[in-house]
Amino acid sequence: MISKRLDMAAWVLLGAICLTGCGNYSNEDLDFQLALPEQSDIAVKMQLSVTRYNSANYYLATRSAITTFNNMVVDLTGLIDVVRGYTPTSRNGAQRIWGPFPSDKYPAWEIRVVMQRSTVSPTILHMDYWVQVRPVGQGDSAWVSFLTGNYESHGSARTGAGEIHLWANDVRTAGYPVDDDPGLVNLDHLDVTYDNSAYPITVTMTIVNLPTTPTQSGTYTYSQNLDGSGRMTFDSQGVTDTGVPITANMTSQWLGSGAGRADLTANLTPNLPTPSILLLGTDCWDLDTVASYSYRLRDSVTNVPSTTGSIDTCLF
């Protein structure tokens, strides 16, 4: 749906380096910096083991999904890391602005980062932020938001709940050459919500593609417990080659050690009130990542149901 790396953080950071410097922070600037999500706030954490030639297929699929998810997190947080590394260009009460500065990649465009602070209560701080682009020489009405987000603290500056939104089609419509990145050609928008105020930590990432793409949307849902155990689901919604809507789901669960289980299901009636869920397969694995139990509704070779190992070995 989108590439593992969005390849966008560099043009923000390079432009900022050219026009801003380090130092001269005010104490209030720290509030703005602390409100922005870091990679560790929303990345999936799973104890990864060295893969083997016979590692469980669904363990490998889980590992691949985590890598894809975390790479997208790196790129999204990279877009706003400039706020942590450099002083604001302007300060106006509860607002901070970085830029505008020219885009290294597209000289006809310029970029800015805007943050706005508001106080919900004496112990809760709310922050909104925007990464925006516009053609050089245009007025304020020409700014279009590429990325928007918000954060609300709970208990401390680094714990709370927030959202991040990437608006690929909005900047595409405005003429920004977003489709130069192959990973964004099919993307309409991407949404992330997260809450790290208490365990379990939760993160949801929803990818919405343009209506013309076969895979129209996908959703990652992740939760992490205090003991390091976790759970991740990935839903993919699209149509078959005969035009029939279908939803596939993989749900993976693991202990802090990395041992776990994954189930692959399909909803054959996603548009009906009562779903028709079909279990396509299950893998359970130990610390060595090798399947202790494996079930397939259709074996890839024989095309008949197959089972190896005992389901009693599954930890979930």
What residue ranges belong to the model's regions?
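N-terminal "mature head" segments of proteins
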Residues: C22-L125, Y293-F316
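Sec-dependent bacterial lipoprotein signal peptides
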Residues: M1-T20
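Short polybasic amphipathic segments
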Residues: Y129-V131, G162-E163, I201-T206, A262-A266, ...
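Short helix-loop boundary/capping segments
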Residues: V144-T251
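Hydrophilic extracytoplasmic domains
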Residues: L255-F316
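Short N-terminal edge-element motif at the start of the domain
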Residues: L79-P177
